[in-house]
Amino acid sequence: MKQSALVNPASMKGHYDNFHFAAAARSSDLLICSGQLGVGPDGRAIADPAAQFAAAFEGVRAVLAEAGLDFSDVLEITTFHVGLTQHLGAFMRVKDSVLPAPYPAWTAIGITELAFPGCLVEIRATAQLRKPAARAAAAKPKAQAKRAARPAKKKAARRR
């Protein structure tokens, strides 16, 4: 696989170097994201389930952002749960606060354990890559906001 097809946010470089997997890979018009866990900066599972779920979604968000995408580009998520029925309500509240309508396809799978002790969920996602024109259109409002925020002095100097 070409290195250019891989997506690895700087914050996840350690995972790539230590565990030998990419955060995501581009394939045709899809971004296929590796599973994200709800761990803190120390690499340990976050104790509070809702905070852990939010951190796992934040990991997905970081991978999407590195590829120029956001949650509105997600087509499908698969979630792997330790204690699925015990934590499903809390997970759904977090999921619904993060994923916008129209909602992506979702499969939730109950499992006995994850790679990191104490982790309750791993979230993997598949997203639709944007065509270059769509990326430019998405960036346009940001560029317009930057131009509007420029000091009036510069605008006056250009008029002279």
Regions found by a protein language model. Give the residues of each.
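N-terminal presequence-like segments and the immediate start of the first folded domain
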Residues: 1-75, 81-160
